[in-house]
């Protein structure tokens, strides 16, 4: 086991959880919450639990070194020290969590962006289209990305389809599929983050809302209903609002 860890650390200095916490506590002027969050979420570590950074100065040096490596491909590159001073003490630039974890990280494949909005080009109401989105969502979440996508294109419950079922199951089963996929993905103790949305004029919009309110049904996603001006005018004027009959 020692030999394996020695190989995995690639000759880098390592720190215990307590060493990193105490150094970070000093960095954050006694703020225990900030120190714990930084050590647990953003300090460079490998899958064996080895910690390679003792405080954010080490992290900022890692970021500066990697950004400088890319800078050197172009004319008039910024030096590593210049970039470090811009990042140091979170003074001028505070990167998102994804970049703080992912840039220069040779132990983990991580996204360099926190959030993604995804969807298929063209028709995406087929089961194959739904599965494609599910796979794309999982791959992004594996890399610490949060994901959002819209379900307004899915045919409402009872719509005719050309398969053995003859009619569509509607939005709710697909909400559950995406929600379950999100709960199954965990990276460094973090569950995937998912936002699902639907237009208020979709015939299944009420079922969409009810699904989230049903205990244990859609626990892996936040949901959002997109409201249009016509709906708001109907509310203000106490009028009826008609949804689309088809998608």
Model-derived regions, located:
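Extended catalytic cores of very large enzyme megasubunits
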Residues: 1-245
């Amino acid at each position: 086991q020692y030999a394996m860890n020695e190989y995995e650390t690639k000759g880098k200095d390592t720190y215990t959880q307590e060493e990193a916490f105490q150094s970070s506590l000093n960095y954050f002027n006694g703020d225990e919450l900030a120190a714990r969050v930084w050590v647990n979420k953003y300090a460079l570590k490998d899958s064996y639990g080895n910690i390679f950074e003792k405080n954010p100065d080490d992290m900022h040096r890692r970021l500066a070194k990697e950004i400088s490596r890319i800078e050197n491909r172009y004319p008039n590159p910024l030096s590593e020290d210049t970039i470090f001073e811009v990042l140091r003490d979170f003074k001028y630039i505070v990167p998102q969590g994804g970049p703080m974890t992912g840039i220069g990280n040779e132990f983990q494949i991580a996204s360099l962006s926190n959030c993604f909005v995804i969807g298929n080009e063209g028709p995406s109401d087929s089961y194959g289209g739904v599965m494609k989105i599910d796979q794309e969502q999982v791959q992004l979440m594996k890399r610490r990305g949060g994901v959002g996508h819209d379900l307004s294109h899915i045919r409402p419950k009872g719509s005719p389809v050309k398969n053995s079922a003859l009619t569509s199951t509607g939005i709710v089963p697909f909400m559950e599929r995406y929600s379950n996929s999100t709960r199954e993905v965990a990276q460094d103790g973090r569950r995937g983050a998912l936002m699902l949305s639907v237009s208020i004029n979709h015939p299944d919009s009420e079922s969409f809302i009810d699904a989230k309110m049903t205990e244990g049904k859609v626990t892996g996603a936040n949901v959002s209903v997109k409201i249009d001006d016509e709906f708001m005018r109907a509310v203000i004027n106490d009028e009826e609002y008609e949804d689309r009959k088809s998608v």
